[in-house]
């Protein structure tokens, strides 16, 4: 399922970002809900939609997005402390939520054209990022043609986009490159059958 529309705005339509302390308090406040949904998350093998809805409504996916681009402008210390707090409710949910928040940090460090594409509708994206370079990307006009199979795409069920590590071969030498694609351009195989994650 896709994340719900972003509702983390005041009545005037201006987002009110959280400070570091407010973000940690929000994460601590998520603990009872995460405890109550831990069994459901285990059975579903993904975050319950109610959890995604709460994170989206809070604006927390904006955590690492720079404030001048519509985010909270917080740093890695904040996401670490928030993740630690949420883990008291459900470690696997805290892991997944933090992964989905973290990948906006990569976008924030990318070129403006990337930010414009991914943040066109809202100033964050929900995106997994498998790290192993198990696919290839061939340069084509306007981008790359990617092919491969990537595993462990944490949170892909709720994603808009995916970011994958690929091998780009130029002049016979493979180079590791991160490439992005809309979720609509990939096939998701439901192969995640594990416990405790």
Label the predicted regions.
Residues 9-11, 170-171, 194:
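Intrinsically disordered, low-complexity segments enriched in small/polar residues
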Residues 142-144, 170, 196:
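Beta-strand-enriched cores of mature, soluble protein domains
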Residues 7-9, 177, 192:
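Compositionally biased, low-complexity repeat tracts
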Residues 14-22, 103, 135, 164-169:
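Short low-complexity stretches enriched in small and charged residues
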Residues 149-190:
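A short core secondary-structure module
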Residues 47-57, 61-159, 174:
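Glycine-rich flavin
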Residues 2-81:
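Alpha-helical interface subdomain recognition
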Residues 190-197:
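Short, intrinsically disordered, charge-balanced linker/junction segments flanking boundaries
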């Amino acid at each position: 399922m896709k994340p719900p529309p972003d509702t983390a705005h005041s009545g005037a339509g201006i987002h009110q970002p959280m400070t570091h302390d407010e973000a940690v308090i929000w994460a601590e406040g998520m603990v009872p809900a995460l405890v109550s949904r831990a069994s459901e998350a285990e059975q579903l093998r993904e975050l319950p939609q109610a959890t995604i809805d709460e994170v989206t409504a809070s604006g927390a996916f904006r955590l690492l997005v720079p404030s001048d681009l519509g985010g909270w402008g917080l740093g890695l210390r904040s996401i670490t402390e928030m993740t630690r707090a949420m883990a008291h409710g459900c470690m696997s949910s805290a892991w997944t939520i933090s992964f989905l928040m973290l990948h906006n940090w990569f976008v924030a460090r990318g070129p403006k054209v990337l930010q414009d594409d991914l943040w066109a509708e809202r100033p964050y994206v929900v995106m997994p990022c498998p790290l192993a370079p198990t696919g290839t990307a061939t340069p084509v006009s306007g981008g790359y043609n990617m092919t491969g199979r990537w595993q462990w795409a944490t949170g892909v069920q709720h994603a808009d986009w995916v970011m994958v590590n690929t091998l780009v071969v130029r002049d016979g030498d493979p180079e590791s490159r991160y490439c992005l694609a809309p979720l609509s351009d990939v096939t998701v195989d439901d192969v995640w059958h594990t416990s405790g994650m």
